[in-house]
UniProtKB/Swiss-Prot annotation:
Gene3D superfamilies: Nucleoside diphosphate kinase-like domain (3.30.70.141). It is an enzyme of class 2 (transferase). This is Nucleoside diphosphate kinase. One of its GO terms (cellular component) is cytoplasm. GO terms for molecular function: ATP binding; metal ion binding; nucleoside diphosphate kinase activity. ATP binds at residues 9, 57, 85, 91, 102, 112. The gene is ndk. The modification Phosphothreonine is found at residue 91. It is found in: Cytoplasm. Belongs to the NDK family. Major role in the synthesis of nucleoside triphosphates other than ATP. The ATP gamma phosphate is transferred to the NDP beta phosphate via a ping-pong mechanism, using a phosphorylated active-site intermediate. The lineage of its organism: Bacteria, Bacillati, Bacillota, Bacilli, Bacillales. It catalyses: a 2'-deoxyribonucleoside 5'-diphosphate + ATP = a 2'-deoxyribonucleoside 5'-triphosphate + ADP; a ribonucleoside 5'-diphosphate + ATP = a ribonucleoside 5'-triphosphate + ADP. The modification Phosphoserine is found at residue 122. It comes from Halalkalibacterium halodurans (strain ATCC BAA-125 / DSM 18197 / FERM 7344 / JCM 9153 / C-125) (Bacillus halodurans).
Amino acid sequence: MERTYLMIKPDGVQRNLIGEIVSRFEKKGFTLIGAKLMTVTKEQAETHYAEHKERPFFGELVDFITSGPVFAMVWEGENVIATARKMMGATNPADAEPGTIRGDFGVQVAMNVIHGSDSPESAKREIDIFFDSSELNEYDKVVNRWV
């Protein structure tokens, strides 16, 4: 079963959006197998955003993601990566469709509420940055027969 890493960023946590966002993924039929409220360390942030290291906004990304708690999650389900990307909406909330998380709640590119893995490789890498394997729970849900 495919897994993805999703993170509600500090702006989403501060705006009390955790429940709303988790509910959307649960209603879609995905299974939450790991979750925690945490403060991202500078080392984790730099590893997570390593692909942007040479970009002028790298420091701002690291500062923002370490500025307050995030809600880190691992979700499992059929096509969860692509579906989560659609549910999140465009990176720039101004371009995100209404009904998507960023379209409904995003304020600006820097504060766009949520991060989600963009590929199976990214998902594995990001899950390994933020979770120990002992923090992930595999279980069967009766509802899985219906979704």
